[in-house]
Every structure is written in structure tokens, then in C-alpha cells.
């Protein structure tokens, strides 16, 4: 995904140069309206490894090149059997098919289609036994295709045959660790995994690492509640170590007992030795999802909450309107009347899930006019709407009077080609 975002960033410059100008930004016919976004329809696919779900995958609307996805790696034992869990949400899954390719995508080693998916609670379960002769310690690309009423959704992971990698132990440890951090009584047992350089009370929640104090690791006095469960995603794994990323959402009550929402991302590097897991590295970033309905105003500006210091923002010449980006959402702020408007967001106001809240996209502000209109570029993975599941670049114009953001141009991205709408 980082490769795609980097490619999108490079193509963004080319795209802007090719489409820049007032005629495009202001006079083109509208092709989309952010208020008309349909709900996400693509299911999620995960791997069930000894009753622990790992490697959550999101659907793409078109086949991607085999070497494009480095989001996850799924280890295989000698049986070469895998169990997949599909969360269909409201979609009907007609069939599950998969394809194994060499890592560069040049050769198809195996492809099969499975129509009998087993219903298990909220999930559909699929058992796969890979029949191809896979070399030990060599990565292969696996493409999964779900046939839906809305079309076909594609999912990607890498598979590798390695012995004694303890993948399920690593995944279970990550799940235990992050859940224990949310429980003060359980968190006391985490001290042996840390290398604290401070022992004071928690004063920061955005840049936590293995050298942070136990109080900081366990969220200090924030008392958060789990809102969206995390699924461990294995990034790298071998016979001695593993790197795992976990993303989840928390809520917390502020001093006025109002609910705040946080996007959390954690990185774990671990070693399995002598029947136990050692934590080699731990990093956590927590970013608050901005909510304009909360008391965010101060005499000299607005409070963005817990986040990093690098803010994408732009103001008009008179400094009467300021546009800023936070957690994949675009906002406008008028200091004169202390008015905040949400300009663009994939997030649903209620009944949302990870499909609409994931931030594998970014926003670049191009211009803020004297009237408060905003031109901006959205690029990356499209969470929902008519372009759900595509990597793309869209130029938007926000009309402040109408409080509507409309897309005036859109381009799909592929690994080595583009297609214009």
C-alpha cells in the first residue's frame, strides 16, 4: 500500500500539471457528490490461524499486478492448508476463487474456485489446500476473488512456506498485549516486555514506544474503550522474528463527558525463543478523529487533539478561512465566527466500520478562495462510493455556500497504467 501511495504522490504532480487551471477546477461538469456516497459493499477477508484472525484484507475493484501488494504475508506449514474467514456485511458472496503466482506475477501455479462457503456466525468460512509444489522460504503472490452481486472484488496477500515460524503465537501475543493495555489490572503484567526510560505518569499518547513507561503504554488516565477491534497483520516473518502491525479504534470521554474517537496504529517486532515471546520493538501512534461538534475552540485557534505535529493546511489571503486535514478528513474553519465544516470524509456518521474509516488515502489542499471555496486533490484507496476499491486521484471543488464537495475529475491508478473516467 505504501508503494501505491508513493506512486499516487508522484502521479499526483503529473496529474495536477495535466489538469490544472481554473477551467478544470471551476467549470467542469460534476461527476460525484460526497453526500451521495453509497455504503461500502466489498467484504473483508481474513485468515483464521488457530482461532486467531490475522491479515485483514480489503477488496479492490480490479485485478492488481501480483507484485503490487506488500500489505501482508501469510505463512504456510507443511500441510499447506489455510482457513479464510469472509465478513460479507450486507453483500452476497456467490463464490471464492484463488490464484497462486510467482512473486513477480509472471507464472500462474494454481487457481481454483470454491462455491460452497460455510456460514459461521457473522463470517463465511473457506478451507483451502494448496496443491502446488511451493519452494521453502520463497514468497508467492495469492489473489483471492469474491464473486458478488455488485461484481468481483479482489484481495491480496503473500504466502510463504516456512517451518516453525510460530505465527499463531505472535498473533495471539499481539492480541493479548493490546487488550491488556486497555485494562489497568492486566497491564501490570506487561512491564517485563518493556524497556522504559521514564517512569512518570502518561502525558502523551501519540508517540509511544518500547521505552515508554507502563503508564503511557496503558493509556494513563485516558480510560479508553475499544470501538473497532484490531486484527494483527503480519508484515514479515521468519524462523526467529516477526513484524506485525495492528490498527484499531478507541473512544474516550473528555472532561465534559463527551465522546472522542481515536485511530490507533501499533507496530510489534518480536522474537520467539525458549517457548516464550520477547518484544524487540514496539511503537504506537494515536490520532484523534476531529469532531467539529465538540468544544474545540480557543482564543487563538482550535484544538486538533492528539495527533502528530505535521498538519496539512492552507488559508486564504485574508486568513478568514482555514482548511486542514486530519485522519483522512478535510475540514474548513472560519476564525471570525468560530464555524467548522466537514468538507470531505469517507467516514459514516453512525454504524460505520473499518471499511469506511481506514486511511489508505490522503488529501492535498490546492487552493482556498476569498469566498471560502476549496479546491483539493484526493488520492489513494477509495473506501466507498462509485469508485470503491479503486486506487485513484480525484480533483474536488468545495462550494462553501452550498456546503457541497463535488468531484470534477477522476483517474484510476494501476501498478503501471492509468484509466480516465
Predicted regions and their residues:
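Contiguous beta-strand segments within globular domains
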Residues: 63-88
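Short solvent-exposed beta->alpha transition segments
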Residues: 186-233, 341
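Beta-propeller blade signature
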Residues: 391-401
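Structural signature of eukaryotic scaffold interfaces centered on beta-propeller domains
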Residues: 305-318, 362-373, 419-421
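Conserved small/polar residues in nucleotide/adenosyl-binding loops
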Residues: 411-418
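Short glycine/acidic-enriched loop and turn motifs that connect beta-strands
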Residues: 251-252, 329-331, 381-385
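Short beta-strand edge/turn micro-motifs at domain boundaries
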Residues: 44, 59, 107-116, 135, ...
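Low-complexity, intrinsically disordered terminal/linker segments enriched in charged
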Residues: 32-54, 74-79, 92, 164-174, ...
Amino acid at each position: 500500500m505504501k508503494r501505491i501511495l508513493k506512486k499516487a504522490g508522484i502521479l499526483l504532480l503529473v496529474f495536477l500539471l495535466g489538469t490544472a487551471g481554473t477551467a478544470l477546477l471551476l467549470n467542469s461538469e460534476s461527476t460525484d457528490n460526497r453526500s451521495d456516497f453509497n455504503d461500502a459493499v466489498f467484504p473483508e477477508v481474513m485468515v483464521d490461524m488457530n482461532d486467531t484472525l490475522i491479515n485483514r484484507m480489503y477488496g479492490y475493484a480490479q485485478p492488481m499486478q501480483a507484485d503490487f501488494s506488500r500489505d501482508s504475508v501469510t505463512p504456510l506449514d507443511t500441510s499447506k492448508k489455510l482457513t479464510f474467514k469472509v465478513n460479507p456485511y450486507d453483500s452476497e458472496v456467490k463464490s471464492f476463487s484463488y490464484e497462486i503466482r510467482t512473486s513477480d506475477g509472471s507464472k500462474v501455479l494454481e487457481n481454483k474456485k470454491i462455491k460452497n462457503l460455510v456460514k459461521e456466525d457473522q463470517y463465511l468460512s473457506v478451507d483451502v489446500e494448496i496443491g502446488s509444489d511451493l519452494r521453502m522460504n520463497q514468497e508467492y503472490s495469492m489473489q483471492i476473488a469474491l464473486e458478488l452481486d455488485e461484481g468481483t472484488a479482489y484481495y491480496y496477500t503473500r504466502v510463504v512456506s516456512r517451518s516453525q515460524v510460530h505465527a499463531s503465537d505472535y498473533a495471539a501475543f499481539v492480541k493479548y498485549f493490546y487488550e491488556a493495555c486497555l485494562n489497568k489490572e492486566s497491564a501490570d503484567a506487561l512491564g517485563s516486555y518493556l524497556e522504559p526510560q521514564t517512569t512518570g505518569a502518561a502525558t502523551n499518547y501519540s508517540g509511544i514506544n518500547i521505552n515508554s513507561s507502563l503508564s503511557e503504554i496503558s493509556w494513563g488516565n485516558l480510560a479508553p474503550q475499544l470501538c473497532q477491534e484490531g486484527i494483527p497483520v503480519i508484515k514479515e516473518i521468519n524462523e526467529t522474528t516477526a513484524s506485525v502491525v495492528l490498527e484499531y479504534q478507541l473512544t474516550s470521554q473528555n472532561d465534559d463527558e463527551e465522546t472522542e474517537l481515536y485511530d490507533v496504529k501499533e507496530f510489534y517486532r518480536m522474537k520467539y525463543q525458549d517457548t516464550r515471546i520477547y518484544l524487540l520493538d514496539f511503537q504506537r501512534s494515536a490520532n484523534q478523529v476531529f469532531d467539529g461538534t465538540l468544544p474545540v475552540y480557543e482564543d487563538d485557534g482550535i484544538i486538533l487533539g492528539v495527533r502528530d505535529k505535521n498538519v496539512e493546511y492552507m488559508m486564504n489571503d485574508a486568513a478568514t478561512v482555514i482548511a486542514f486535514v486530519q485522519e483522512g478528513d478535510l475540514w474548513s474553519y472560519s476564525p471570525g465566527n468560530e464555524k467548522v465544516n466537514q468538507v470531505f470524509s469517507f467516514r459514516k456518521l453512525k454504524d460505520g466500520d473499518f471499511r469506511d474509516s481506514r486511511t489508505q488515502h490522503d488529501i492535498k489542499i490546492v487552493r482556498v478562495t476569498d469566498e471560502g471555496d476549496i479546491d483539493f486533490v484526493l488520492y489513494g484507496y477509495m473506501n466507498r462510493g462509485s469508485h470503491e476499491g479503486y486506487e485513484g486521484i480525484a480533483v474536488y471543488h468545495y462550494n462553501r455556500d452550498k456546503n457541497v464537495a463535488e468531484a470534477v475529475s477522476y483517474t484510476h491508478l494501476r501498478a503501471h497504467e492509468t484509466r480516465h473516467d
